[in-house]
Amino acid sequence: MRKRFLGAMLLALGISLFGGWGSAQANSVPEPTQSMLHVCWLKDSHVNPAACEVVRMPEAFEPAKAVVTSSVDFPDFQVVALDLREVTEEGYPIFNVQSIYYKDFLRATEPIIIVMRDSESFPRNGIAVRDSLGRERIFGIAISGEDGSLLLSEVDR
């Protein structure tokens, strides 16, 4: 119990200090990849759900439906399950990442709906894409504590 509490405190400290879920975001030069990806609640989107592919996470919470869109085509798109593995001494969370769904490309014209797992204080749902330099980038889908909207935040494996 005490270990869990300390881990949660370190996680909160890392988030508040670095503004993200992982050191990848805090230590890398920002690249437009994250700004080209968008996530929002299905109820807040302007997409026709009947025209979208739907991916269900294991242990999905039916009302928690997110829409992922992009302004460009991204290769090697994945929907991933995130599980907190550890929090480093510096307060960075490290996640186990399991691919749930793979698609050759996330196309700008083809939004995807994700029926997500229930989230707690850290993201349990995410996406991965390959950026313009060929690197895999993993983003957790988190709920904003300010307005309840969805946010993408880069995470470490």
Show where each model-derived region lies.
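Solvent-exposed serine/threonine-rich low-complexity stretches and specific carbohydrate-binding patches
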Residues: 92-106, 142
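Short, surface-exposed binding/anchoring microloops in extracellular/periplasmic proteins
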Residues: 44-85
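Bacterial N-terminal signal peptides
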Residues: 9-19
